[in-house]
Amino acid sequence: AERRQYAGGVSNGSIGFSAMDYALKDSVGAAGISARKFWACYGDVVVCLVANLQAKNLHEPVYTALDQCRLQGPVWVNHEMQELPMGDHHLQNVQWIYHAGFAYIPAQPSTIDLQLKSVSGSWTTINASEITTPLQDKILLPVLRHGSLPASFAYALAYAKSAKDAKKLSAKPTWQILQNDSVCQAVSFPDGTVMAAFYAAGKIEAGKKTQVQVNQPCLILLQKDKLYVSDPKHSGSSVTITINDTSLVLTLPADGTTFEKQVQQEK
């Protein structure tokens, strides 16, 4: 196993995001997987970014499970008038999936394996002290398949009243991916809110009037005249953040908690 230093989050109490430099290796370190991962929560939407996904000495396909839950009604994919039957489905060019009030929306049309079926198991398989009685239930399990690596990708999980609304949200998302690579993962929302995870010194264009630059790794949430920052490396060091022409030097808490600062943005 491998534990990297970079992990943290930022919140203003109602919205926020988490990010981490993720790595997983086998017991001898011969095989493993790594990626930069980012989850932004804003209203009824969670935007998920994965950058620089890499695998070493793996002989099985690499995939991301978008969800795994009890099946709670009909499932629609790309067409709001056509329900998907039970079974194992290998789906190409997926733009959206709708189930039980939720829309699953990949940033680009994607290949997804979707399980709609009954499965069985027992709690004792994950905890020896639990009961051995077999349990059975129907599940929904959408799995995003990845092709050649390294790769970067994104998807969103959003509340939607109907399959028709899921289709509309896929066509006109309420979020914009500003950057998704090994240096920075960032998204913005219609009110100008920006959430950005910097893994190194860098700069992003966050709309026509906002430019954000940092001199070292940090997590930033910018909403109107408030800046929220944290230190994902938990070092307690100072960071210089430049918003347009205004530079701020901030000493961040070493425990990774959010630091709040009033800022003045161009109108």
Regions picked out by a protein language model, each given a short descriptive name:
Residues 1-87, 92, 101:
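Catalytic and substrate-binding regions of extracellular carbohydrate-active enzymes
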Residues 2, 7-22, 26-29, 123-133, ...:
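Edge strands and adjacent loops of beta-rich recognition modules
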Residues 106, 148-159, 261:
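Short Pro-Gly-centered flexible turn/kink motifs
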Residues 74-89, 126, 248-267:
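Solvent-exposed beta-strand/loop surfaces of large extracellular or lumenal domains
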Residues 82-141, 203-206, 211:
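Trp/Gly-enriched beta-strand surface patches
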Residues 31-38, 139-142, 213-214, 220:
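Active-site-adjacent structural elements in folded domains
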Residues 158-267:
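Non-catalytic terminal regions with compositionally biased, polar/charged low complexity
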Residues 4-11, 39, 89, 95-97, ...:
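Short, exposed beta-strand/loop patches in secreted or surface proteins that constitute
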